Regions:
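DUTPase catalytic domain/fold
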Residues: 1-132
Length: 132
C-alpha cells in the first residue's frame, strides 16, 4: 500500500511487488511492478516521480522521467527504472522505487489559433528571462 512517511510528505512511496529480485544492469531499464492500482476521481491525476535517494546514491531513475496516471486508468502502476550508473543495481520485493503525488488538474478546452497575444517575453525561452 503506498504510504506517506511523514505528516508533511506530499508523495506516497511506491514499493516494488516482485516474486524475485530484479537486477538492472548499467545503462538498462527494467519494468518494476507495484501491485497497486488506483481509481482517481475525474479531474485528478497521479504523477510518479523519482525517489531522490535512488537517483543520487545509485543512479537509478524513472525511465520516462515522470509517469502520469490518468483518472480513467485502472491497471497496475508499473515503474520503468533506468540504471544510469556503472554498477548493476538489484531491486528487491518491498523496496521503495518511486513516489506518487496526486494532484487536481484543470483540463482546458484547446482552441486552434493563428494569433497569439503579444507579451513582453514573446517567444524567448531557454534562459532568455535571465538576460537583461
Amino acid at each position: 500500500m503506498p504510504a506517506r512517511k511523514t505528516a508533511g510528505s506530499v508523495g506516497y512511496d511506491i514499493a516494488a511487488c516482485l516474486s524475485e529480485d530484479t537486477v538492472i544492469p548499467p545503462g538498462e531499464t527494467r519494468m518494476i511492478g507495484s501491485g497497486v492500482a488506483i481509481a482517481l476521481d475525474p479531474g485528478y491525476a497521479a504523477f510518479i516521480y523519482a525517489r531522490s535517494g535512488l537517483g543520487i546514491k545509485h543512479g537509478v531513475v524513472p525511465a520516462n522521467c515522470v509517469g502520469v496516471v490518468d483518472s480513467d486508468y485502472r491497471g497496475e502502476i508499473i515503474v520503468g527504472l533506468k540504471n544510469t550508473s556503472n554498477e548493476q543495481f538489484t531491486v528487491c520485493d518491498g523496496d521503495r522505487v518511486a513516489q506518487m503525488v496526486i494532484a487536481k488538474c484543470e483540463i482546458p478546452e484547446l482552441v486552434l489559433s493563428g494569433d497569439l497575444d503579444e507579451t513582453p517575453r514573446g517567444g524567448g525561452g531557454f534562459g532568455s528571462t535571465g538576460n537583461d
